[in-house]
Amino acid sequence: MRTLYPEVTPFDHGMLCVDDSHRLYYEQCGNPHGKPVVILHGGPGGGCNDKMRRFHDPDKYRIVLFDQRGAGRSMPHANLTNNTTWDLVADIEKLRVALGITRWQVFGGSWGSTLALAYAQTHPEQTTELVLRGIFMLRRWELEWFYQEGASRLFPDAWDRYIAAIPPVERHDLISAFHRRLTSDDEATRLAAAQAWSLWEGATSCLYMDQDFIASHENPHFALAFARIENHYFVNGGFFEVEDQLLRDAQRIANIPGVIVHGRYDVVCPLQNAWDLHKAWPKASLKITPGAGHSAFEPQNIDALVCATDSFV
């Protein structure tokens, strides 16, 4: 079974100004003359971490990571202004041009898979391959499954902690109820809602519960960006024209090679998502990891993702 590549440090990093207010942190690792790949983090709002550098062979790949608008080290932190899917798609292109890259592989999981599909369908000529994990397409049923009723029946203990932040009278629409608190003028209200929202996802992302991973979701800096930006996208339907836009436009990536990795026991983004995408994009190979959940860092997901990236060099 494959494991992550050894730790690697960036050979370049900086801040890219993408509009009058947003500045994005980016970094480059691996071989400056290698095959380019851009890593798209989840959330939206999750930001990059050092382990995300390690799915690609650093001797063969030029590995580009960046924090999307409002996330991680990008500024302004947790900001929702001019923060849409299509702003992020444009940002990826601005980063590609700024780094002098002609075409690149696009790698992303969860929300990163959403953004990767949106980017590749908009810029297929610039996309050499797609390596996707934990498919998420922001359809209404997907949001209701995780944030209203569905996953709640598998994790009732974590669910009760999640909904404790919302009075019973508002629980018929939890995404909207959290939105009111995450956009409150009161800092304490925003933080309490952000931590409840973030801990719910942290508690459900792994097949075997990882207490350190869960605790990391309570960090105020992480939680505020993660919850505020996620919720902002969800109340706006991902800023898509129709909820199944990524499936509707799958023909635009029909000839792009790809690998879809999805955990059989992914509670955050059910396997149905990957199945639907694979039927719409048969050129991609689908790898269902039989003993994994949602997290990219579960052993079987790591193995499948590293095998996928190795196959393209």
UniProtKB/Swiss-Prot annotation:
<dbReference type="InterPro" id="IPR029058">
    <property type="entry name" value="AB_hydrolase_fold"/>
</dbReference>
<keyword id="KW-0378">Hydrolase</keyword>
<dbReference type="GO" id="GO:0005737">
    <property type="term" value="C:cytoplasm"/>
</dbReference>
<dbReference type="InterPro" id="IPR005944">
    <property type="entry name" value="Pro_iminopeptidase"/>
</dbReference>
<feature type="active site">
    <location>
        <position position="266"/>
    </location>
</feature>
<feature type="active site" description="Nucleophile">
    <location>
        <position position="110"/>
    </location>
</feature>
<feature type="active site" description="Proton donor">
    <location>
        <position position="294"/>
    </location>
</feature>
<feature type="domain" description="AB hydrolase-1">
    <location>
        <begin position="35"/>
        <end position="298"/>
    </location>
</feature>
<keyword id="KW-0645">Protease</keyword>
<protein>
    <recommendedName>
        <fullName>Proline iminopeptidase</fullName>
        <ecNumber>3.4.11.5</ecNumber>
    </recommendedName>
</protein>
<keyword id="KW-0963">Cytoplasm</keyword>
<dbReference type="GO" id="GO:0006508">
    <property type="term" value="P:proteolysis"/>
</dbReference>
<dbReference type="GO" id="GO:0004177">
    <property type="term" value="F:aminopeptidase activity"/>
</dbReference>
<comment type="function">
    <text>Specifically catalyzes the removal of N-terminal proline residues from peptides.</text>
</comment>
<dbReference type="InterPro" id="IPR002410">
    <property type="entry name" value="Peptidase_S33"/>
</dbReference>
<keyword id="KW-0031">Aminopeptidase</keyword>
<dbReference type="InterPro" id="IPR000073">
    <property type="entry name" value="AB_hydrolase_1"/>
</dbReference>
<comment type="similarity">
    <text>Belongs to the peptidase S33 family.</text>
</comment>
<dbReference type="Pfam" id="PF00561">
    <property type="entry name" value="Abhydrolase_1"/>
</dbReference>
